[in-house]
């Protein structure tokens, strides 16, 4: 019970009004605080600040990854090259802006119910664009079949201007386009993964996707499903 302790606590609090007691109280308070600061410093040693990534807007430095873009109606939008764009799920305004940008095909890799797929297809086709649906999990790595569908479309439609999206445009989209960079543009797995981070891939939540991309060159070289693409160059 705390009730019997209240008079004692009250008297101790009143003592702090005395200047001498206040100095003594502060001196005792400093000891645990200093110990906490020392313990934190041991557990978190100082490191030099990491270098900031090269900005795509810095004229003094080359653009290392895709170009970030501002597009009304969609977020996390990026231009990888002249025919391949990426980003989040667009709203109605976003689809209109993509059509004005010259996008000819929307590639939706969300795994969603058929009603949502039907509505998006209708909206996209009403704007004169093509709609491609490759449903992929937001938590698991893509299957070989899902990537084969994506690679096959790129190979068979080299003049299409694509916008690839999932929900937020960071995790699933990042994995698909990292695989594209490795296969068609011969990027290293590390560089492809760094571009995933550049477009806000959430490594903490999706370690399996990171490991998948790090191991993708070896998997691509061995899987029979990817045999038709092993001698590919950039589709342009």
Residue locations for each model-derived region?
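Bacterial N-terminal signal peptides
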Residues: 30-40
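Short cysteine clusters
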Residues: 166
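Short, low-complexity interaction segments enriched in Ser/Thr/Pro/Gly
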Residues: 10-12, 48
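Glycine/aspartate-rich loop-and-adjacent alpha/beta segment that forms the canonical ThDP
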Residues: 172
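Extreme N-terminal basic, low-complexity initiation segments
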Residues: 2-10
């Amino acid at each position: 019970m705390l009730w019997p302790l209240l008079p004692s606590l009250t008297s101790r609090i009143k003592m702090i009004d005395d200047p001498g007691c206040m100095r003594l109280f502060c001196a005792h308070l400093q000891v645990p605080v200093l110990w906490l600061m020392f313990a934190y410093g041991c557990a978190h040693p100082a490191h030099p600040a990491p270098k900031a990534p090269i900005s795509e807007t810095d004229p003094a430095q080359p653009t290392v990854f895709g170009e970030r873009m501002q597009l009304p109606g969609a977020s996390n939008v990026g231009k990888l090259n002249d025919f391949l764009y990426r980003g989040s799920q667009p709203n109605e305004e976003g689809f209109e802006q993509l059509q004005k940008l010259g996008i000819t095909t929307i590639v939706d890799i969300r795994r969603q119910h058929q009603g949502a797929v039907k509505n998006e297809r209708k909206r996209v086709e009403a704007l004169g664009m093509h709609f491609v649906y490759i449903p992929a999990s937001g938590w698991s790595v893509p299957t070989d079949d899902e990537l084969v569908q994506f690679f096959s479309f790129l190979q068979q439609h080299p003049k299409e201007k694509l916008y690839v999206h999932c929900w937020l445009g960071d995790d699933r989209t990042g994995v698909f386009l990292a695989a594209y960079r490795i296969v068609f543009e011969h990027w290293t797995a590390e560089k492809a993964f760094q571009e995933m981070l550049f477009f806000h891939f959430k490594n903490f939540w999706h370690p399996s996707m990171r490991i998948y991309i790090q191991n993708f060159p070896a998997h691509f070289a061995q899987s029979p499903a990817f045999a038709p693409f092993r001698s590919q160059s950039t589709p342009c």
